[in-house]
């Protein structure tokens, strides 16, 4: 039969795959004989198409060999019981498959079952799993007993005997088991086993059944990621079975050796495999895998050198239908190197045989790789777009949630409780669901014989049995495209960079999803052919999950209610690639919202719907937790505030009316909203000055844009005054030097250019003043300040000043060309005198001592007149001739100085000058005399006015002082009082610069007075504790009512017993509060900013007498507020009125507390009588008057009883007095009611005088009382001494009471 196949068909390089197919069903039926899986595969042949031509050829080949199938079925039927044992046993058993085949042939009873199974295998395509079992190895180990029988079937294609031994066993199974079968196999096996085109096909356990010749040659030089499944196969393992024994050592251990084990056949097989299979080239990348991962193998690189191997057009392979789909989707290039690490252990004993690979297949593989890379890039771009859409959606969701959070306040606590309850319920429900799912999975595993979707992965399992168990245990599987190691590393680097960027941009709520995304770095990104699948670990405690990407079957209901594409993986998980730790998973599960089930999923969402689902999962979780925490903190604060409010209400009922009553104060806070908009605009402007650098954003100082103002305020703008100064300098240049240049010969041809330069510089200043400044000056029209450019320009053009400015700039200099440079042509420049006068006014307005400038200006007028006269004198002398007469200038010395001296003597009329001789000289001299008299008289008068204005205040002070002294002398006031008055005048004048501020305030409007009062007094009044919390406008109104008064040292500000109608605020200086028995003891010293007398001012029910004397310690300036003015203000501010009354009541209560210590008996209470003494008294009383020395002890005992009764009565009287005083002193300052004398009851003890109002402690009256106690107490214990105030405030009455009289009163 085999010879016929060899003659008809070309030599198939993958014939060992046929044996793999035969070996695959063996473990299937072997582990699951009782589950009756055979009828089920016949029902499910349709969902798995067979698109590839090579697998189609493999299927008919299986049909042509019916006798092999039953034998293989038998082998599989008996291989099952040893699967679990082999998982724990040593992996290597070289002749396991062949031996198992022989043993099963010895059983004719199983021939029918095996033949039926092989026939069923024709109909049902057998899927081959490359490495899905390796990925889910841990999950599969959790329940090998449950699902091992089902998972054995797909592993048949990757069985250890798939390469060479499988064909041998399949052919030996056609006949009875005997030695001749082995001999015949030995002779014909060489014909059946052709040289494989690619070493990866011969090495692979599972993929060889699916790998065809046109696909594999492209990938032998590429690196594929695989994981070491514990490196099971040792050296003695057969080369044929070696790659398969590595993934599933348990299967080999379970197979029993046949009774006739031919050693020759094993040696021959080893020799042939060494020649046929190429040796893999190992790389260091494999060592980077975790050594502790038994279910995975390291990545290996296989180098295959093309040698005399011809390209094969057709390859006959026995391949399952599932593998046909896998070849179409994944390609053989990604599956060839899975078994390379397995062969790594045996590479030392094997010879590397280079094989020739077809170039066409390599090109096809490269094209596929390029396509895959393009698809991956497209997928990444789509993912980035999706992430951007996610972020936008998240921001929108956040905004919506923030709005909802404002509406939800107190409901959060209830929701939190409900969420906890729901979580507990969901946990219970999930546990129940997991149990049900496990049961359903077991049932479905029994019903389903073949997997629905191929599951490929980068992992290689230890044995085909484990792989099959895992594949059967998973009800949902999908094919994952395997990539070479280099491509995988690039993907990992790219994804890591993306994750780093996302971590910087996204918030904490997105970090959970980033950790999930990191887990998918080792997997292949989802594509159209390979959509992603999220894996849900039903045994979450066993270990972390492996990220897998599979296609969820439509008939499988979703495990998790939140995710429809979740794959439940029962069983314990072994060590795998580094994934998020269990602690991280626990944190992620805690962060999930109660609506989501605790499913840990790793995936890159391929659709916007999946992306939305994951975003909601993380965003709602983190946001809910943050919202709940914030809400709880707010609730705690609210509860604290409510408790404080309730306490205040219970303590003082006025608080309720203060807070519950509608307040107009918020209406006054409304204007603050308008200025709030200005900072927003300012911030908007400031944002422009932020500079973004590499990773930070900092604020830089904006460039100062010096722009000329659009309008100028001539009254307050200092820059305009400075400009006027330069204009005045130019004007003075012309006024002073034009006459000099005209009269004196100082302008010559050698320096004419300097004079002209200065002239035209002054002209330029004039021109700027006209064109730039004067046209921008603001002016008042109809009460409004006009700042419009056009109106300001028109106003200047229509003014008289513009006309004078035009005249002063007449271009008479053009006449220089005809008349020469004559300085007189520049006389119009002196017409800009209006700028000079304006400058004087503006400068005097800003100077603190304007009279100084006035004096200087008047002196300048005098000097200028002398300057002009000297120029005229030199001109007259030159007109008549220098030195022609005795009166003219003789030309000796400095001409200007000598002429100036002559002008001074002439104008001041000092005399001593030569007499004029000619008519011209006489007329000129007369004009000089008249001018001098007029000029000097004006100058002297102006000087007097200037000096008088400078001393006007001092003059007023002297006049007031003189009037007051005259008044005091007229009424013969004592000299001491007169001195105090004079001192007051001097101090007030020197400290304030005026005698009465009110005189100035009366002249100003209310707004001006308020502004001045705020600047002067607000800082002091705002620090007063009494007015803190009051309406700010009320304080402003109060400032206008304050009066400033100066007190001299030792002046009484207020005296004890006076009716308090004023409150005092210390502005400067100190005052002392006096008290004590003599009223001279200093109780307290109050400094600037302190307040006293406020209780009398706020007293409601009278009793507002002063309780102490207050004396100025030095010169003290006090602000006084009358009670009448305060009441008028408080009428408009009811809330502030209630607040002030509340504070006044508290002060009264605080001042009433010390009364308990004041009403104390002068004689201190006696110590308790000793018990022994009482016993002696009792005995003496029994003995009668005779005992105890004539009854002295009995008499003493009676006395003690009387004293005790008197003390009790005194205490009752004190309590009554305290009750009365507390009622009467409701509104009195500093418990003023208690200070009123009560002579009606001379027997009750009277308190000593109390201290003044707020800050003064009670006067220490213990010293005088102690002195009386020392004087009167010891000599006469039966006498009671009391001190009570007399009719006058400064008098006290001392009363002495005998005990006998007191006794009668008590009786």
Swiss-Prot record:
SMART domains: cNMP
Cross-referenced InterPro entries: CNG_cation_channel, cNMP-bd_CS, cNMP-bd_dom, cNMP-bd_dom_sf, RmlC-like_jellyroll
Region annotation (Ion conduction pathway) ranges: 850-949
Residues binding 3',5'-cyclic AMP, per UniProt: 1106
Region (C-linker): 952-1028
Annotated site location: Central gate: 936, 940
Region (Calmodulin-binding CaM2) location: 1212-1218
Biased composition (Basic and acidic residues): 165-174, 387-406
Chain segments annotated as transmembrane: 721-742, 752-773, 789-808, 825-837, 850-872, 896-922, 923-948
GO cellular component: intracellular cyclic nucleotide activated cation channel complex; membrane; non-motile cilium membrane; photoreceptor outer segment; plasma membrane; rod photoreceptor outer segment; terminal bouton; transmembrane transporter complex
Keyword terms: Calcium, Calcium channel, Calcium transport, cAMP, cAMP-binding, Cell membrane, Cell projection, cGMP, cGMP-binding, Ion channel, Ion transport, Ligand-gated ion channel, Membrane, Nucleotide-binding, Olfaction, Sensory transduction, Sodium, Sodium channel, Sodium transport, Transmembrane, Transmembrane helix, Transport, Vision
Compositional bias segments (type: Pro residues): 550-560, 1250-1261
Region Calmodulin-binding CaM1: start-end pairs: 621-631
Molecular-function GO term, any one: cAMP binding
Binding residue positions for 3',5'-cyclic GMP: 1093-1094, 1096, 1106-1107
Record field: compositional bias (Acidic residues): 43-59, 361-386, 407-451, 483-518
Site residues by UniProt (Occludes the pore below the central gate): 944
Highest taxon in the source lineage: Eukaryota
Skewed-composition ranges (Low complexity): 1214-1238
Region feature (Cyclic nucleotide-binding domain): 1032-1148
Xref: PROSITE patterns: CNMP_BINDING_1, CNMP_BINDING_2, CNMP_BINDING_3
The reaction(s) this protein catalyses: Ca(2+)(in) = Ca(2+)(out); Na(+)(in) = Na(+)(out); K(+)(in) = K(+)(out); NH4(+)(in) = NH4(+)(out)
Quaternary organization: The rod cyclic nucleotide-gated channel is a heterotetramer composed of CNGA1 and CNGB1 subunits with 3:1 stoichiometry. CNGA1:CNGB1 channel binds Ca(2+)-bound CALM1 via CaM1 and CaM2 regions of the CNGB1 subunit; this interaction modulates the affinity of the channel for cNMPs in response to intracellular Ca(2+) levels.
Function in brief: Pore-forming subunit of the rod cyclic nucleotide-gated channel. Mediates rod photoresponses at dim light converting transient changes in intracellular cGMP levels into electrical signals. In the dark, cGMP levels are high and keep the channel open enabling a steady inward current carried by Na(+) and Ca(2+) ions that leads to membrane depolarization and neurotransmitter release from synaptic terminals.
Protein name, per record: Cyclic nucleotide-gated channel beta-1
Organism of provenance: Rattus norvegicus
Gene field: Cngb1
């Amino acid at each position: 039969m085999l010879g016929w196949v060899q003659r008809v068909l070309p030599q198939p390089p993958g014939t060992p795959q046929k044996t793999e197919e035969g070996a695959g069903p063996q473990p299937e039926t072997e582990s699951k004989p009782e589950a009756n899986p055979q009828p089920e595969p016949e029902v499910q042949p349709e969902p798995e198409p067979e698109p590839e031509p090579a697998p189609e050829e493999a299927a008919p080949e299986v049909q042509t060999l019916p006798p092999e199938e039953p034998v293989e079925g038998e082998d599989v039927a008996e291989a099952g019981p040893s699967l679990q044992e082999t998982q724990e046993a040593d992996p290597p058993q070289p002749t396991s498959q062949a031996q198992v085949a022989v043993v099963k042939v010895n059983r004719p009873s199983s021939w029918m079952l095996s033949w039926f199974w092989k026939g069923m295998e024709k109909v049902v395509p057998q899927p081959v799993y490359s490495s899905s079992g390796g990925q889910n190895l841990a999950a599969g180990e959790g329940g090998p007993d449950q699902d091992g029988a089902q998972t054995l079937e797909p592993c048949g294609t990757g069985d250890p005997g798939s390469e060479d031994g499988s064909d041998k066993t399949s052919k030996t199974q056609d006949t009875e088991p005997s030695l001749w079968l082995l001999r015949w196999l030995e002779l014909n096996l060489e014909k059946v086993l052709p040289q494989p085109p690619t070493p990866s096909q011969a090495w692979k356990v599972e993929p060889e059944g699916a790998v065809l010749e046109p696909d594999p040659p492209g990938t032998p030089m590429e690196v594929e990621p695989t994981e070491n499944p514990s490196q099971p196969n040792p050296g003695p393992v057969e080369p044929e079975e070696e790659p398969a024994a590595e993934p599933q050592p348990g299967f080999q251990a379970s197979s029993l050796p046949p009774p006739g084990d031919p050693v020759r056949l094993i040696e021959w097989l080893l020799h042939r495999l060494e020649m046929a299979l190429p040796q893999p080239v190992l790389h260091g990348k494999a060592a980077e895998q975790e050594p502790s991962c038994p279910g995975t193998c390291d990545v290996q690189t296989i180098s295959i050198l093309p040698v005399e191997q011809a390209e094969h057009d057709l390859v006959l392979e026995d391949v399952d239908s599932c593998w046909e789909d896998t070849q179409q989707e994944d390609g053989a290039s990604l599956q060839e190197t899975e078994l390379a690490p397995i062969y790594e252990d045996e590479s030392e004993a094997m010879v590397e045989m280079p094989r020739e690979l077809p170039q066409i297949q390599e090109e096809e593989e490269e094209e596929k790789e390029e396509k895959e890379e393009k698809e991956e890039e497209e997928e990444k771009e789509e993912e980035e777009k999706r992430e951007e859409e996610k972020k936008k959606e998240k921001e929108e969701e956040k905004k919506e949630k923030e709005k909802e959070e404002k509406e939800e306040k107190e409901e959060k606590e209830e929701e939190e409780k409900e969420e906890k309850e729901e979580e507990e319920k969901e946990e219970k429900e999930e546990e129940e669901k997991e149990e049900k799912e496990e049961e359903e999975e077991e049932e479905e595993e029994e019903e389903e014989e073949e997997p629905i979707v191929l599951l490929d992965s980068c992992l290689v399992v230890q044995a085909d049995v484990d792989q099959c168990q895992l594949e059967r245990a998973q009800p949902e599987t999908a094919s994952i495209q395997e990539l070479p190691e280099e491509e995988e590393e690039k993907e990992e680097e790219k994804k890591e960079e993306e994750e780093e960027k996302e971590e910087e941009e996204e918030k904490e709520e997105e970090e959970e999803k980033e950790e999930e995304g990191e887990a998918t770095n080792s997997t292949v990104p989802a594509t159209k052919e390979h959509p992603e699948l999220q894996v849900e670990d039903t045994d979450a405690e066993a270990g972390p999950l492996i990220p897998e990407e599979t296609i969820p079957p439509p008939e499988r209901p979703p495990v998790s209610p939140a995710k429809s594409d979740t794959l439940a993986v029962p069983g314990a998980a072994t060590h795998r690639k580094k994934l998020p730790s269990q602690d991280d998973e626990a944190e992620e599960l805690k962060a999930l919202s109660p609506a989501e089930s605790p499913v840990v999923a790793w995936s890159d969402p391929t659709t916007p719907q999946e992306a939305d689902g994951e975003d909601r999962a993380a965003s709602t979780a983190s946001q809910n937790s943050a919202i709940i925490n914030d809400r709880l903190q707010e609730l705690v604060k609210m509860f604290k505030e409510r408790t404080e409010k309730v306490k205040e209400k219970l303590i003082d009922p006025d608080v309720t009316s203060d807070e519950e009553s509608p307040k107009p104060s918020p209406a006054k806070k409304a204007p603050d909203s308008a200025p709030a908009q200005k900072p927003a605009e300012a911030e908007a402007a400031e944002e422009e000055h932020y500079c973004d650098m590499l990773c930070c954003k900092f604020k830089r100082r904006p460039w100062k844009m010096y722009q000329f103002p659009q309008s100028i305020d001539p009254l307050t703008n200092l820059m305009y005054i400075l400009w006027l100064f330069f204009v005045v300098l130019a004007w003075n240049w012309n006024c002073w030097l034009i006459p000099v240049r005209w009269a004196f010969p100082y302008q010559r041809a050698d320096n004419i250019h300097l004079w002209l330069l200065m002239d035209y510089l002054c002209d330029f200043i004039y021109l700027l003043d006209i064109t730039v400044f004067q046209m921008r000056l603001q002016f008042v029209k109809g009460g409004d300040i006009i700042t419009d450019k056009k109106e300001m320009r028109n106003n200047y053009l229509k003014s008289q000043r513009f006309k004078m400015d035009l005249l002063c700039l007449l271009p008479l200099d053009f006449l220089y060309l005809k008349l020469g440079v004559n300085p007189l042509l520049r006389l119009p420049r002196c017409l800009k005198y209006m700028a000079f006068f304006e400058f004087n006014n503006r400068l005097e307005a800003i100077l603190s001592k304007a009279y100084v400038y006035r004096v200087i200006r008047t002196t300048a007028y005098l000097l200028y007149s002398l300057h002009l006269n000297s120029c005229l004198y030199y001109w007259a002398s030159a007109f008549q001739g220098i030195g022609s007469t005795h009166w003219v200038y003789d030309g000796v010395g400095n001409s200007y100085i000598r002429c100036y001296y002559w002008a001074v003597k002439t104008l001041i009329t000092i005399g001593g000058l030569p007499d004029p001789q000619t008519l011209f000289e006489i007329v000129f001299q007369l004009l000089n005399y008249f001018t001098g008299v007029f000029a000097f008289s004006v100058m002297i008068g102006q000087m007097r006015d200037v000096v008088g204005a400078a001393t006007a205040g001092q003059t007023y002070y002297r006049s007031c002082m003189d009037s007051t002294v005259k008044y005091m002398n007229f009424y013969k006031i004592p000299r001491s009082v007169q001195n105090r008055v004079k001192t007051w005048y001097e101090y007030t004048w020197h400290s304030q610069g005026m005698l009465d501020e009110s005189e100035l305030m009366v002249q100003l409007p209310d707004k001006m007075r308020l502004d001045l009062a705020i600047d002067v007094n607000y800082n002091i009044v705002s620090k007063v504790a009494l007015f803190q919390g009051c309406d700010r406008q009320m304080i402003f109104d109060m400032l206008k009512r304050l009066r400033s008064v100066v007190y001299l040292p030792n002046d009484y500000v207020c005296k004890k017993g006076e009716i308090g109608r004023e409150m005092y605020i210390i502005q400067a200086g100190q005052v002392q509060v006096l008290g004590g028995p003599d009223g001279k003891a200093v109780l307290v010293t109050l400094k600037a900013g302190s307040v006293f007398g406020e209780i009398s001012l706020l007293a409601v029910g009278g009793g507002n007498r002063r309780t102490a004397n207050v004396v100025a310690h030095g010169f003290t300036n006090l602000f006084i507020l009358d009670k009448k003015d305060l009441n008028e203000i408080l009428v408009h501010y009811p809330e502030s009125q209630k607040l002030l009354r509340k504070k006044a009541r508290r002060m009264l209560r605080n001042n009433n507390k010390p009364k308990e210590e004041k009403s104390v008996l002068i004689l201190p209470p006696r110590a308790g009588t000793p018990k022994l003494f009482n016993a002696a008294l009792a005995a003496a009383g029994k003995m009668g008057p005779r005992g105890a020395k004539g009854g002295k002890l009995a008499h003493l005992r009676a006395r003690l009883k009387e004293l005790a009764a008197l003390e009790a009565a005194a205490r009752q009287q004190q309590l009554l007095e305290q009750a009365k005083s507390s009622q009467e002193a409701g509104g009195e300052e500093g418990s003023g009611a208690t200070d009123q004398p009560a002579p009606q009851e001379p027997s009750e003890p009277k308190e000593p005088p109390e201290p003044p109002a707020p800050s003064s402690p009670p006067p220490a009256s213990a010293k005088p009382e102690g002195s009386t106690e020392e004087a009167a107490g010891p000599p006469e214990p039966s006498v009671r001494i009391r001190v009570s105030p007399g009719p006058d405030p400064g008098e006290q009455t001392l009363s002495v009471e005998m005990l006998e009289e007191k006794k009668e009163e008590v009786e």
